[in-house]
C-alpha cells in the first residue's frame, strides 16, 4: 500500500514542475516579444527628432533671409541696387538688371559712401560722439544759437573739405558753454593764458633777484666782521710780541 501510494504521488509532483517550465518559457517569449517593439519605436523616435531638427534649422534660415534683404535695402536707399527675392522653398531669383552680383555690391558701396559724405543731424542727450569714419578729425564745437540746445561740429577731411554736423540735445556732464567758443575766443583765451604765464615767470625772476641781493649783502657783512676780527687779532699778537721782547731784554 505504501509503494502504491508513493507511485501515485510521483505524477502529482512532476506535474507542477512541468507547469513551471511552461510558465518560464512563456515569460521569456513574452519578454522578447515586448523588447523588440521598444527598440523599433526608439529608433523611429530618434529618426523623427533628427528630421525635425533639420527642418527647424531650414525654416530658421529661410526666416532670416527677408531680414537680410531688408537691411541691405535700407543701406542701398534709393539707388539702383536690387536684391534677390527668396520664396518659401529657399530658391532665389535675381532681380538686378544685368544679373551681375559684383555690380550690386559696387552700388551698395557707392551708396553707403555717399551717405557718409552727407551732412548728418544727430539727436542725443548724452556724450557727443562723431558718426563719421576715421578719416575726419574734430576741429570745432560751438553753439549755433544760445538757448536752443543745438550745437554744430565742424570737421575737415583729408581732401580739405569742411563738413558740419548738427547736434541737438543737452550738454553732457563736464561740458559747459564756456568750452563751446568760437576760434577768435579760443585765440584770445590762449593769448591770455600765455600772458599770465609770462607774468608769473617775471614775478618769480624778480623775487629770485631780490633774494640774491639780500644774500650778497649778508655775505658782505660777514666778510666785514671777519676782517675786523682779523685786525684785532693781529694787533693783539703785536702787543704780545712787544711784551715778550721787553721781558727778554
From Swiss-Prot:
Stretches for region Leucine-zipper: 219-240
Identification of the protein by name: Cyclic AMP-responsive element-binding protein
Organism whose genome encodes this protein: Hydra viridissima
SUPFAM superfamilies associated with the record: Leucine zipper domain
Region called Disordered, residue ranges: 73-106
Keyword Nucleus (UniProt): yes
CDD domains, A to Z: bZIP_CREB1
Similarity remark: Belongs to the bZIP family.
CC terms in the record's Gene Ontology section: nucleus; transcription regulator complex
Keywords for this protein: DNA-binding, Nucleus, Transcription, Transcription regulation
A GO molecular-function descriptor: DNA-binding transcription factor activity, RNA polymerase II-specific
UniProt-listed InterPro entries: bZIP (IPR004827), bZIP_sf (IPR046347), CREB1-like_pKID (IPR003102), Leuzip_CREB (IPR001630)
Ranges of Low complexity composition bias in the record: 90-100
All copies of domain KID, residue ranges: 35-94
General function of this protein: This protein binds the cAMP response element (CRE), sequence present in many viral and cellular promoters. Could regulate the transcriptional activity of genes involved in regeneration processes.
Domain bZIP: 191-249
Compartments where located: Nucleus
Region Basic motif: start-end pairs: 192-217
Subunit structure: Binds DNA as a dimer.
Taxonomic superkingdom: Eukaryota
Keyword flag Chloroplast: no
Amino acid at each position: 500500500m505504501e509503494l502504491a501510494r508513493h507511485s501515485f504521488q510521483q505524477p502529482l509532483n512532476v506535474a507542477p514542475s512541468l507547469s513551471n517550465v511552461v510558465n518560464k518559457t512563456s515569460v521569456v517569449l513574452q519578454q522578447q516579444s515586448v523588447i523588440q517593439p521598444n527598440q523599433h519605436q526608439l529608433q523611429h523616435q530618434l529618426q523623427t527628432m533628427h528630421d525635425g531638427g533639420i527642418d527647424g534649422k531650414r525654416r530658421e534660415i529661410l526666416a532670416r533671409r527677408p531680414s537680410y534683404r531688408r537691411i541691405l535695402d535700407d543701406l542701398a536707399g534709393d539707388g539702383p541696387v536690387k536684391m534677390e527675392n527668396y520664396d518659401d522653398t529657399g530658391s532665389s531669383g535675381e532681380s538686378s538688371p544685368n544679373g551681375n552680383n559684383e555690380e550690386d555690391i559696387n552700388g551698395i558701396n557707392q551708396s553707403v559712401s555717399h551717405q557718409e559724405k552727407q551732412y548728418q543731424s544727430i539727436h542725443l542727450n548724452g556724450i557727443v560722439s562723431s558718426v563719421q569714419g576715421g578719416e575726419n578729425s574734430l576741429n570745432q564745437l560751438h553753439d549755433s544759437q544760445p538757448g536752443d540746445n543745438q550745437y554744430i561740429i565742424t570737421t575737415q577731411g583729408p581732401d580739405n573739405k569742411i563738413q558740419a554736423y548738427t547736434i541737438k540735445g543737452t550738454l553732457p556732464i563736464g561740458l559747459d558753454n564756456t568750452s563751446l567758443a568760437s576760434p577768435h575766443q579760443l585765440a584770445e583765451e590762449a593769448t591770455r593764458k600765455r600772458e599770465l604765464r609770462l607774468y608769473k615767470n617775471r614775478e618769480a625772476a624778480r623775487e629770485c633777484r631780490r633774494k640774491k641781493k639780500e644774500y650778497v649783502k649778508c655775505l658782505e657783512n660777514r666778510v666785514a666782521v671777519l676782517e675786523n676780527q682779523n685786525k684785532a687779532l693781529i694787533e693783539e699778537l703785536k702787543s704780545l710780541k712787544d711784551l715778550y721782547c721787553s721781558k727778554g731784554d
